């Protein structure tokens, strides 16, 4: 069954980078020290929370591509409208992080000796936000076409770079700025790989905003935006609060167990990403019912 096959590909995309991430993060924790490593995990959270600037377009474009899979003209409008809007909005998000970087750093309750390094790091981090969101958007095109093999080969390479490159930079210069520079380079590599996979569709789309298509994307994506705001807040805000109340060094000790628990969601996430395009283009109620039952039963089977 294609759902199971695609779910396995999604699991591979999660598991392989973890084999690099675990030792890489361990080395960075040792090299940077508790405070700077704690801030690094918060920096990762900032990029993740930047998903609010996605406006639900990643899920919307997966759905739309699945629905209009055989309509070349409409696909071009979908890709162009989503890319143009998201590039503008994510650039605004990056600018906001640049402008308020000093305020963010003050809130994190760090030692004065590390202020310059951390402040410069957050300014550099702001550049990763448009890159991160565009990458997510372009990969969503492949997900809409159910090309999960290509998606997860890209994810495996990209996430391995994202996990390992910061540690590599820290080997040569043990500062947070070096770690964020490594993160930025790895995000650029990830975006380039995504572009190569969908370059023909991006180039041929014409990069023009179509208002009718855009309204349809936003109407669906707007509901997901609510989840994009609430979910990261529930997952990441505890780190900001711990840093503010106890100091950034305590975040390093908290993040490890927290991330381990978060990994328990890998299996349902893998199945969910595989089944979403099928649900989007399912034409009959019986088909929807069958896919929904699979969605519910597959992630729970290993636990039973």
What are these regions (language model features)?
Residues 55-70, 143-144, 203, 261-293, ...:
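Helix-loop junctions and terminal segments of transmembrane helices
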Residues 80-109, 164-172, 192, 268, ...:
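Alpha-helical transmembrane segments of multi-pass membrane transport and lipid-handling proteins
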Residues 99, 112-138, 189, 301:
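Alpha-helical transmembrane segments of multi-pass membrane proteins
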Residues 2-3, 149, 176-179, 192-235, ...:
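Interhelical loop/hinge segments that connect adjacent transmembrane helices in multipass membrane
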Residues 4, 41, 73-88, 122, ...:
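Interfacial transmembrane-helix starts/ends
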Residues 1-21, 73-76, 80-81, 118, ...:
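N-terminal membrane topogenesis motif
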């Amino acid at each position: 069954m294609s759902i199971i096959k695609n779910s396995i590909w999604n699991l591979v995309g999660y598991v392989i980078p973890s084999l690099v991430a675990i030792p890489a993060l361990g080395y960075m924790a040792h090299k940077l020290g508790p405070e700077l490593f704690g801030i690094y995990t918060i920096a990762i959270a900032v990029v993740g929370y930047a998903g609010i600037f996605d406006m639900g377009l990643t899920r919307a474009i997966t759905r739309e591509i699945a629905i209009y899979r055989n309509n070349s003209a409409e696909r071009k409008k979908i890709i162009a409208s989503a890319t143009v809007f998201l590039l503008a909005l994510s650039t605004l998000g990056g600018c906001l992080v640049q402008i308020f970087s000093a305020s963010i750093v003050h809130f994190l309750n760090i030692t004065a000796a590390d202020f310059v390094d951390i402040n410069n790091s957050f300014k550099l981090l702001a550049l990763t936000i448009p890159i991160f969101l565009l990458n997510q958007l372009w990969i969503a095109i492949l997900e809409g076409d159910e090309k999960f093999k290509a998606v997860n080969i890209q994810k495996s390479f990209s996430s391995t770079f994202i996990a390992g490159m910061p540690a590599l930079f820290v080997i040569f210069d043990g500062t947070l700025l070096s770690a964020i520079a490594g993160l930025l380079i790895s995000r650029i590599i990830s975006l380039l790989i995504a572009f190569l996979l969908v370059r023909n569709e991006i180039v041929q789309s014409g990069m023009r905003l179509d208002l009718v298509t855009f309204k349809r994307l936003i109407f669906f994506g707007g509901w997901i935006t609510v989840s994009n705001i609430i979910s990261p807040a529930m997952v990441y805000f505890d780190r900001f609060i711990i840093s503010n109340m106890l100091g950034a060094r305590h975040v390093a000790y908290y993040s490890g167990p927290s991330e381990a628990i978060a990994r328990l969601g890998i299996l349902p996430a893998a199945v969910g990403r595989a089944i979403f395009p099928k649900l989007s283009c399912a034409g009959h109620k019986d088909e929807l019912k069958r896919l929904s039952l699979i969605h519910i039963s597959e992630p729970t089977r290993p636990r039973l």
